[in-house]
C-alpha cells in the first residue's frame, strides 16, 4: 500500500492507495468514530457494500443510504434526502459519513458532512478513476444547480481517502476513459515527464495493468496533494487544476447533466483550451497534436457538441466560478507540463476557436 499526505496543518490527512483495500479490516481501523453512515448509489452498492460493511464490522456500527446513480441526481433535493436520513435516526456529531462511489457520491457526501450539524467527519472511498485521481482529494464538495455545475458547495477536507485499485476492474470502459481525461490533465498542466510516460503506457493502462494504474493514480494524487497544500481554496495555483473545466462545464450544462460524462467534457474542453493557447501564440502546434492524440487514444472527444453554438458556451462560461470582476478566466497550456491563468481573452478569437468557419 502506498500513502500520500495532504499537508494542511491540523487538517492534514492521508491518501491510501492499494489493491483490495476494501476487503481489509485494518484499512478502516483509524476512523475516529464508532458510528459510520455510508452513502453510496444503486450501482456501487451491489459491488462493494457487503465487503466494506464486513471490514467495518469490528470497529464501528454501520448504516447505509443508497442514492440513485447519475450526475442528474447531484442536486439539493437528493442532498436533503441524506439530511433527512441522518436526522430521522438521530445521528450526532460523533458520526462519520463515508462516501462509497464516484465523484457524485463523494461531492454530495462531503457537502452533507460539511453542513450536517455544522460539520461531521467524512471519509472518501472513491470507486471510479476520475474520483480516485481528482474529486476525492482536496476538499471540494458541492451539488449542482440548474444554472451551473457545483455552484452550491464548500471546501471541506476528508479524514482520509481510501483508493482500492481493484474497483477499476468493475468500471464500464466509458467511465474509465472519462477518468483518464483527468489523469492526462495533470501531465498537461504540471508534469511533462508524466505526460510522456502516459504516451508510452497507453496499452498497459487500457489493459488495467495493476502496476501502471497504481503509478498513474499515485502520481496524480501526489501532484494534487502538493497543489492543495499550497493553495487549499483556489486563490492561485490550484486554479490550474481546472484546465478544460470552463469549457467543459459549459458543455455539461448545455447538454444536460449526465448526457456527457464529466471526463468527456473535460477532454473536449482541454483541447479547446489548447487551441485557444495556440491561437494566442502560447502553445506550439505539435503540443496541441500530442494532447489531441492522447485523448483520442482513450476514445475521448476532442471536439464539443456540434449543436452547441459560441453563444451557448459564453452564456454558461460567464457563470463560471472562476469569473473575477466579470471577466472569464481560462486555464491555458503554455507547454506540455506548464499552464497559466488568462483573463480578457478576446471573444472574437474564442468564437473562431469554438466554431471555426
From Swiss-Prot:
Q: What organism is recorded for this protein?
A: Shewanella denitrificans (strain OS217 / ATCC BAA-1090 / DSM 15013)
Gene coding for it? aroB
The cross-references to HAMAP family, in alphabetical order and at most eight, read: DHQ_synthase
What SUPFAM superfamilies does the record tag this protein with? Dehydroquinate synthase-like
Q: In which pathway does it act?
A: Metabolic intermediate biosynthesis; chorismate biosynthesis; chorismate from D-erythrose 4-phosphate and phosphoenolpyruvate: step 2/7
By sequence similarity, the record places it as follows: Belongs to the sugar phosphate cyclases superfamily. Dehydroquinate synthase family.
Q: Which GO terms describe its cellular component?
A: cytoplasm
Binding positions for NAD(+) per the UniProt entry: 69-74, 103-107, 127-128, 140, 149
List cofactor names only: Co(2+); Zn(2+); NAD(+)
Enzyme Commission (EC) number: 4.2.3.4
Q: Which PANTHER family match?
A: 3-DEHYDROQUINATE SYNTHASE (PTHR43622), 3-DEHYDROQUINATE SYNTHASE, CHLOROPLASTIC (PTHR43622:SF7)
Which chemical reaction does it catalyze?
7-phospho-2-dehydro-3-deoxy-D-arabino-heptonate = 3-dehydroquinate + phosphate
What GO molecular functions are on record for this protein? 3-dehydroquinate synthase activity; metal ion binding; nucleotide binding
Task: Relay the cofactor remark from the entry.
Answer: Binds 1 divalent metal cation per subunit. Can use either Co(2+) or Zn(2+).
One Gene Ontology BP term is:
amino acid biosynthetic process
Protein name per Swiss-Prot or TrEMBL: 3-dehydroquinate synthase
A Pfam short name: DHQS_C
Q: Where in the cell is it found?
A: Cytoplasm
Q: Which UniProt keywords apply?
A: Amino-acid biosynthesis, Aromatic amino acid biosynthesis, Cobalt, Cytoplasm, Lyase, Metal-binding, NAD, Nucleotide-binding, Zinc
Superkingdom of the source?
A: Bacteria
Amino acid at each position: 500500500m502506498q500513502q500520500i499526505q495532504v499537508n494542511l496543518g491540523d487538517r492534514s490527512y492521508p491518501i491510501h492507495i492499494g489493491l483490495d483495500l476494501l476487503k481489509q479490516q485494518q484499512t478502516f481501523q483509524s476512523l475516529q468514530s464508532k458510528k459510520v453512515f455510508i452513502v453510496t448509489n444503486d450501482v456501487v452498492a451491489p459491488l462493494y457494500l457487503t465487503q466494506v460493511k464486513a471490514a467495518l464490522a469490528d470497529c464501528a456500527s454501520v448504516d447505509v443510504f443508497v442514492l440513485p446513480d447519475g450526475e442528474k441526481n447531484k442536486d439539493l433535493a437528493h442532498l436533503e434526502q441524506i439530511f433527512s436520513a441522518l436526522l430521522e435516526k438521530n445521528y450526532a456529531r460523533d458520526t462519520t459519513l463515508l462516501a462509497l462511489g464516484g465523484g457524485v457520491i463523494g461531492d454530495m457526501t462531503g457537502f452533507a458532512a460539511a453542513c450536517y450539524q455544522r460539520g461531521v467527519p467524512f471519509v472518501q472511498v472513491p470507486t471510479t478513476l476520475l474520483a480516485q485521481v481528482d474529486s476525492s482529494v482536496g476538499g471540494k464538495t458541492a451539488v449542482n444547480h440548474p444554472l451551473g455545475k457545483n455552484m452550491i458547495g464548500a471546501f471541506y477536507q476528508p479524514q482520509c481517502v481510501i483508493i482500492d485499485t481493484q474497483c477499476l476492474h468493475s468500471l464500464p470502459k466509458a467511465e474509465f476513459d472519462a477518468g483518464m481525461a483527468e489523469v492526462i490533465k495533470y501531465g498537461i498542466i504540471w508534469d511533462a515527464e508524466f505526460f510522456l510516460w502516459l504516451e508510452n503506457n497507453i496499452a498497459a493502462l487500457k489493459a488495467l495493468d495493476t502496476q501502471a494504474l497504481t503509478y498513474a493514480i499515485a502520481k496524480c494524487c501526489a501532484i494534487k496533494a502538493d497543489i492543495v497544500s499550497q493553495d487549499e481554496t483556489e486563490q492561485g495555483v490550484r486554479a490550474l487544476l481546472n484546465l478544460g473545466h470552463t469549457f467543459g462545464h459549459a458543455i455539461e450544462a448545455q447538454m444536460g447533466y449526465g448526457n456527457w460524462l464529466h471526463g468527456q467534457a473535460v477532454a473536449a474542453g482541454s483541447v479547446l483550451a489548447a487551441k485557444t493557447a495556440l491561437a494566442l501564440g502560447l502553445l506550439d502546434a505539435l503540443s496541441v497534436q500530442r494532447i489531441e492524440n492522447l485523448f483520442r487514444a482513450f476514445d475521448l472527444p476532442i471536439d464539443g457538441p456540434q449543436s452547441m453554438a459560441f453563444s451557448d458556451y459564453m452564456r454558461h462560461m460567464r457563470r463560471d466560478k472562476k469569473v473575477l470582476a466579470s471577466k472569464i478566466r481560462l486555464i491555458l497550456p503554455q507547454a506540455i507540463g506548464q499552464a497559466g491563468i488568462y483573463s480578457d481573452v478576446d471573444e472574437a478569437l474564442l468564437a473562431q476557436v469554438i466554431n471555426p468557419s
